[in-house]
């Protein structure tokens, strides 16, 4: 349409590490959002917890002792196409452009299975921030619900069953509130329909 598109996307996101105490231009490896926390812990010289499955993206640089980290997250700032549909490309971003001229960026996966969402699903802030902080892939609600429906545990959910039994016993009404959509990153029509079964 020729207009900037600002919805959730499957774009990779840029990742940059600057060491102000070094003249070295750091080149982080490509990875996913789960790799940010382990990279920060490496900079701080803190051992990565066993539950963090992400990796350190800066392998060949010594940061030294007693370092501090400033993490800046540009939420929604992905690497889109260099055309009129990309608001970052269309916008005036002189500081960002200068960073690109001086430093080396890597690209991180921020959608789909890389952040605990369904295959091919666009990323969102909630999934992104959970993965950044956890240092591992955190299965999101839609993935957990789909798994529960597949293995049958969804239909054995004690709270759901108690509510349905109470409504049946009291000849009452059960109101289901949910997102009736097939494309939202925050819900799907499948879940309230599954409760009706």
What are these model-predicted stretches?
Residues 1-197:
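Feature captures the catalytic ectodomains and active-site-proximal regions of enzymes
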